Amino acid sequence: MIGTKSKFDTYPDGKIVVLGGSTVKEDVLLAIGKQLGIDKTRFEICLDYDALQKYNVRKMQYAPQYRVILCGPAPHSGQGKGDSSSIITELENSDAYPRVERLVAGNELKITKSNFRAKLQELVDEGYI
């Protein structure tokens, strides 16, 4: 699936947000980023499924310091989802958020080492991050 493009300008060296429940540890994701030449300070990561319900996505509205949001499995309810059916739907359908990319394994949202690496590599190759 092709990610949604940001409707406003974001900083090319902005934050890479990773949202979604995962068994892959944050340190592993940061190491993958480092292997691709991405500094760990660029990442903002929330991998705890329960913590995602309290994660306020609205802080990223029209915030150019956020470059891209990588989404794995997330609760349907959560802060900032507005009238949307889920947090991810809100992020994808609103012009107020930076570019959104889904991390998918098989036919389901899932954060794996391989799809995380592949998505980051795709964004690097594209010159987006």
Regions found by a protein language model. Give the residues of each.
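Alpha-helix C-terminal capping/helix-to-coil transition sites in glycosyltransferase folds
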Residues: Y62-P64
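Short acidic, S/G/P-rich loop/turn micro-motifs used as interaction or catalytic elements
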Residues: S22-E26, D50-L52, G72-Q79, N107-K110
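Extended, charge-rich low-complexity interaction segments
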Residues: Y66-I88
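N-terminal targeting/trafficking signals and adjacent low-complexity tails
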Residues: I2-S6
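Structural motif
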Residues: D50-R58, K110-R117
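Short, aromatic/basic amphipathic alpha-helical patches
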Residues: L29-K34, K81-N93
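Redox- and metal-dependent alpha/beta enzyme cores, enriched for Fe-S-associated oxidoreductases
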Residues: K7-V57
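Ser/Thr/Gly-rich flexible loops in soluble cytosolic domains mediating phosphotransfer, phosphorylation
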Residues: S86-I129
